[in-house]
Amino acid sequence: MIELEGDSPVACFAAEELRRTLQRIGAPALPVVARATGPRIALRYGLGGDGFLRAPDRDGLLLRGDGPRGLLYAVYDLLEALGCRWVAPGPDGERLPRHERVTLPTAGLADRPALAGRGLVIGHDHFLAEAESWVAWAARSRLSTIFVHTIGRGPALGACRLSSWRDRRRALVPRIAERGLDLELGGHHLSDLVPRRLFRDRPELFRFDGTRHTPDRNFCPSHPATQATLRVNGAAFFTAYPEAQVYHLWPDDLLGGGWCACPLCAGLLAADQALLATNILAEVLAELRPDARVSYLAYHDTESAPRVLAPHPQVELIFAPRPRSYAHGIGAPANPINAVYAARLAENIALFEREEPARGSPSVFEYYLDGILFKSSVPPLPEVIAADMVQYRDAGVRCVRALLTGDRPWLFAPLNAYLFARLAWAPAQCAEDLLGNYAAARAPRAPESLARAYQALGAAWHPALDRTPAEAALRRDFPTSRDVVTAPPLDVLDYMAAPRPHSERRLEQLRASEDWIALGRTAWDAVIASAFADGPSLAAERAEWELAASLLHFLVMRQQLYVLADREATAPVLRDALGEAQTALDVLIVWARANVPPRARAGHLLLRGIFQFHLDHLADRQLVLPWQRAALRARRAADARALLADPRLVWELLRTRR
């Protein structure tokens, strides 16, 4: 029997999960009762917390959670001890044993998380559409939070439509609640609260750029009328979405230059202006929902801590180090990029800890699952995630969230999802052992080969991720001009135009990746040869791996092209290098046409077009004649028109908030 004391909905769900899964792996149907009269598994829970214990006793086995959610984790821990595995969402990520007789473990244990908060950020409608499987996986992986990252107006290329959440929340909120997961909502919505349509009659509400007021970015947070508008529309947002425990209403997503320079804002850094707006929203939230919080985002031009203002008690710090290096842990002292971000995190934590910190503060927003940052193919990062979790824990971070986004749905979920969930709970685990556990669940007939394939891919990607400060300085917002051939956008991995010797050294390091990829392909051949019923699932996972390998090859060829141009190579040599880079890009396009579903393909190819602009930029600068430049731009305009023939993409690019 399963004996459950109490009527918490989360505890009841835990009991049902235990009953159902035990039966699936070979146990008899066990009734759930309030008081057992014979051998039983007893389920108990306290007032709150994620820790749990498992203890054999004279009547069977006791599972006790610090709170109802801790009890649910105790159930999943017991099921894992019996051989159950959930390494990815959905049926392909589940592996359940089949026992003739289920024997309960005789050893006891006690466990609790190193980080109080461990969150999955659902950051695109692709993933919101399959959120049921992600929510179930998150609970089984001992994550504590689901954050639905949304956008109101503008293209939703890296977030869910707020209207999509409204369409889905009736189905998803009960699933999140029955598992005891916290729910967070929002994104770059701050400008939505001061609508641009007000500019015509009230230009003073909007930022002063040094010469005039403009409605292009953010607003003037110091103007009393702006603050009044924030209060009214902030209250409306909080009231419209009462299901959230944390609200994220962030400034515009840009590298810098989006805040106000009027006399009222004189002396306020970008960080202070952002915190001023957030504090106003926190005051409103305190009146409506004293139990909820609103986040302050330290990101890009607000990474450095505010100098003038202090946070409201209901403001939670969330630090987002997107431009960091993912070749090393965030606290690696020898890495000149990450050392800066570790210092900025520390100064933000110091500011927030001087006040009475909000319950989830300080927290970090990480990018281990970001298909936009990593160009639609996330590299495996076991050692980096492990090092990060240790550093974040030791720095006093209470919660780490990982952004799940991209320009297409995955064929199979990235390995980093499994690694992040496990390491956020217990950072001291050996990353190599975790990879082995994953491989044993995914490819039980060839686990060593699958582990080698991922180790090879990680080694191949390392030099692509190990940027220098000179390379990191090359980023450029999109769009930067009307002529994207002359000034194409540059993101974190677009460092090919760095000055010598950085570009030369990067090319030399990148070329070594080809040998690692060859080793990985050999390992994958062994995995596929051993596959049986899991063949289609493993083939999908390999397709994702191959995309990562092909993407890396393109980065090598692009780097080679730019280095040769910098060496002033002859035109024939440059044309050959351009042809090689174009062929590598064409491989990515062919992969997309075969594997990206039609509903997402145009958006994916639109972002792939940025790679084409990088090649065109070099050709325009070094190879084509003046009269050919117009023809080059005409071809790219024709490509854009072909993509825009897809009405779904046109709608996405033109639609505004519903």
Locate the predicted segments by residue.
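Substrate-binding groove of N-acetylhexosamine-processing glycoside hydrolases
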Residues: C12, A171, R179-G180, A228, ...
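Short, well-ordered beta-to-alpha junction loops that form the rim of enzyme active sites
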Residues: W250-L254, A298-Y299
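Conserved beta-strand positions in the central sheet of alpha/beta enzyme cores
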Residues: F147, E184, H248-W250, I318, ...
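Short, well-ordered secondary-structure micro-motifs within conserved domains or adaptor modules
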Residues: L30-D50
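Feature activates predominantly on carbohydrate-active enzymes
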Residues: S8-E17, T21-I25, R54-E243, L254-L268, ...
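Short, hydrophobic beta-strand segments that form beta-sheet elements in well-ordered domains
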Residues: R40-R44, L120-G123, I146-F147, R293-H300, ...
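Right-handed parallel beta-helix/beta-solenoid
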Residues: M1-P9
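Solvent-exposed coil/turn segments that connect beta secondary-structure elements
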Residues: G46, D66-P68, D252, R322
